[in-house]
Amino acid sequence: MASYASEVKKELTSLEVHPEHAKAELAAFLRMNGVLNLHDHQFSLDITTENPAIARRIFKLIKVAYGIEPLLIVSRKMKLKKNNQYLVRLNQQVQEILENLQIWDTEKGLVTRIPKRIMSSREGAMSYLRGAFLAGGSVNNPETSRYHLEIYSTYEDHNEDLAKLMNEYFYLNAKMTKRRRGYIVYLKEAEKIGDFLHIVGALNAMLNFEDLRIMRDMRNSVNRLVNCDTANMKKTASASAKQVEDIQLIQKEKGLDDLSEKLQILANFRLAHPELTLKEVADQIPDGPISKSGVNHRFKKLHEIAESLRE
């Protein structure tokens, strides 16, 4: 059974590739997952994934953005996992493409920050975030887990830029933290996770997420009400048991006839109805209805009498 995150990524990979946005999405893939090789004085760039839909997406992004068809190599992992492994290899115009995407600088080498042209464009930011999520993102199933969406990045400054895109353009309240050999930017608020899914184009996943979130919140609300009712019932039962105990002691030691009329009425009513709450006693007592505070005052009087008999 596919994970929730896999379903989200499946939807994203099925989106149409727009020529004007392809480079921003591709830049995220290459910056986060690309491996640069040098053989016989020639550069090649590899991106490896176990997700065939993501491999096809990368292939199409390169073709749309630069008119080049990269190699697509499929191999089978023979160890513990038996999933196919998909390698997209670019071996034409590698340096030119990396420079065009501002991933490589001839003087500085690898550029890990997100280019200003993407940082300054809302549409570019949306496409880059889509690529970043496909390259290194995950999201928990809102039905079974705590709310959590994250994107992993090797470089701290790249992680900072991802958070900046999320917060300055889309107000997602993204947070950052170190994770093993890299960094993550993450979201914990259900509403913000839904917003992110909408931003990157996973509309069906967003609607599904919202449905699951609403159902989960409703279940939690019902559980809270049930727990509250249970606690109140226990509290009522405990208070009633103590009141009955006081009345039975008075009845045994001196009899209820010795009490004032109001206390007699309450004592007999409580013995007959130990299950009632304080409010129900106040509403249903034969000489009532009276206020809860009035009933409580009478019970205190009975308790004082019982305590004097215990001494």
Swiss-Prot record:
In the UniProt record, does the keyword Lyase occur? Answer: no
- Residues of the signal sequence? none
Query: Which part of the chain engages DNA, per the record?
Result: 277-311
Question: Molecular function terms in GO for this entry?
Answer: DNA binding
SUPFAM superfamilies linked to this entry: Homing endonucleases
Q: Which NCBIfam families match?
A: DNA_bind_WhiA
Record-given protein name: Probable cell division protein WhiA
* Gene name in the database record: whiA
Q: What does this protein's UniProt record list under function?
A: Involved in cell division and chromosome segregation.
Q: Which residues cross the membrane?
A: none
The entry's keywords: Cell cycle, Cell division, DNA-binding
- One biological process GO term for this chain? regulation of sporulation
